[in-house]
């Protein structure tokens, strides 16, 4: 199986490296500009496994012979991917979070169907240039089951062979959207506050974030069924529970706090703003509460 991984960031690098080295896939990397490949060092945080992978030269368009084009770009960059897929007939699998209108717009721009996916990998590149990542046991990479089936089942088998648990399901877009809108308010608050501790010590911001998260969950229930772990975690989230939870995580795995601050904070400010705007629009369209989401968005835009 030939897989074109579109997006050369940490997430795309983990999927590409594991599919190539352990999933028996021929992998190419598609980025904004063609450039030489490089040697990538990957470190799995949760079990200490390391992987050295020499990525091929990057290309600026997915190849005609690819079976799957795996989209791993930021939310605000999704529309810009369209020209990079103009030469391929591959099945388009999108791991980037999408709301239902996003998938419709993206499919229209491509002129063909788009398959929703949901990643299970957490990854970042550290200051030494290594890709550090987690494969949480409770998470699954979901790939939408479509008809006709195409290469989906084979792709899921390759992911599983690579060590990334994966499954097919029909409601992946709804599941992803419901989970995303539930968590984005907390990302918005982290972006506003600048750090986990800043959010936890700012009572007004924390209260606003939790109310916005409640509105996000309400919207999520309209869109679909969020991942079970997400629903359970957010249902019991409160100021005391969050402070205690952060304390436990920091004592056991301080690196995850740094990852959250880097990945969901100011570094992704543009993505946070665009996604927050889309969520407020969806809440307006679906008639769910949005007062706290709107206030938090206003603070995010400052």
Label for each model-derived stretch:
Residues 154, 158, 207-222, 274:
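A non-catalytic, amphipathic alpha-helix used as a structural packing/dimerization or gating element
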Residues 221-302:
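NAD(P)-dependent Rossmann-like dehydrogenase/reductase catalytic/cofactor-binding core
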Residues 130-142, 193-201, 255-266:
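Helix-loop-beta segment of a Rossmann-like dinucleotide-binding subdomain
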Residues 3, 25-27, 92, 114, ...:
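Hydrophobic anchor at the start of a short beta-strand
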Residues 1-53:
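NAD(P)+-binding Rossmann beta1-loop-alpha1 motif at the extreme N-terminus of oxidoreductases
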Residues 99-100, 104-181:
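Rossmann-fold dinucleotide-binding core
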Residues 48-131:
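Rossmann-like NAD(P)(H) cofactor-binding subdomain of soluble oxidoreductases
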Residues 172-217:
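Active-site-proximal catalytic alpha-helix in oxidoreductases
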